[in-house]
From Swiss-Prot:
Pfam families: Herpes_UL16 (PF03044). It comes from Gallid herpesvirus 2 (strain Chicken/Md5/ATCC VR-987) (GaHV-2). Interacts with cytoplasmic envelopment protein 3 and with the capsid. Disulfide bonds: none annotated. GO terms for cellular component: host cell cytoplasm; host cell nucleus; viral tegument. Keywords: Host cytoplasm, Host nucleus, Late protein, Virion, Virion tegument. It is found in: Virion tegument; Host cytoplasm; Host nucleus. Coiled coil: none annotated. It comes from the Viruses. HAMAP family: HSV_CEP2. This is Cytoplasmic envelopment protein 2. Belongs to the herpesviridae cytoplasmic envelopment protein 2 family. Plays a critical role in cytoplasmic virus egress. Participates in the final step of tegumentation and envelope acquisition within the host cytoplasm by directly interacting with the capsid. Upon virion binding to target cell, a signaling cascade is triggered to disrupt the interaction with the capsid, thereby preparing capsid uncoating.
Amino acid sequence: MTTQRLKIPRSTRHQHSGRDCDGMDIEFVRRLNERIIIWRTLRAESRLVVMLALIALDSSLCTYVTPNKQPRKAKWVEIFMYLTRPKNLYLSRKEFHILFLANGTRAYSVTATLRIHPILHEGSSADVIFFSNVSSTEAYAIIPDVTSEFLPTTPCIELDIDVFVERTQPPDDPHNCIPISIGVWWSFSKRRFYYLRMEESLLAICPAGWQQRSLSATLAKFINHESGCRECREHCDLHIDAYNVLWECGSFGHTCLCRGPCMWIKARQRDLLVEGDKSLGCVLFMDMVNSVRLITNPSTETRITERLEDVIVAGVGYSNIPVNSCGWHLVCLPEIWSAIMIQGCIRLTRLCNDRQPNVV
């Protein structure tokens, strides 16, 4: 293992007392345990396992992580995890010495028991891991050089959001949520996304190659001007592949539920002209329309609903044209996959992790 010498207690652990540093180690791991994080194995040797995770940087991690100096990576946290079992620590069979290196500048050293949860199939190199029986311990005077690690360049698997979602009804507390986009809600109590999805049969009349079935993405394609503004064009820059632990948007990022009509996301405008692909109008309305009105005002009322007509109607001059209500249904993305989507999206991290639930 290639290493470089660092005096960890002073240069990478804030200049606190040993007692404070111990607390920082444990608190950092506690912050990790508050999330569903995917760890991808980089190396698995007889005496060393090296794993990597990529997550969005939110307010709860700012105390423990120095932002990456590269602009593209400044909003993310890259965590290397080194697992060993030094004989001098007399660890129990399931315990490990764990060294975390966050963004290459902060080191945290603990002993802990790992609880590993494969989420797709046995033998995958990507797993959810939680840590229990956590105790702070001395870090090594020589720590690994993360720049020498071979990082993955290909995904473990291409994720399809439609494989994981479940058709459902609104939860018992439909108002205890926040709007993520048009027809997309984050439920505080259920810790998952609910959204309106197009019936699969309607894909046959969509433009060639169109596969996204969420109402928010469909409306964005229908309404947004085709050239797109800077924010629209930079969608991929706001995402990483948190499941495959890759510095790229990935299939989950391309289908992220943060997509939506540009002028609603930026200015909360509710009367929107159709400036995009008008051929998608046939899956939304029973006839062609040139404008769309959003029903719900997120500043006064938010409610998870299974009815398309509760979310959008035809705009001014087209009020007699009904929506295609039979073509849409409510689905939810299970908690674990909702969490993974949040970890890979800057906007969802801000909306879901840094917001307090409504009082109901």
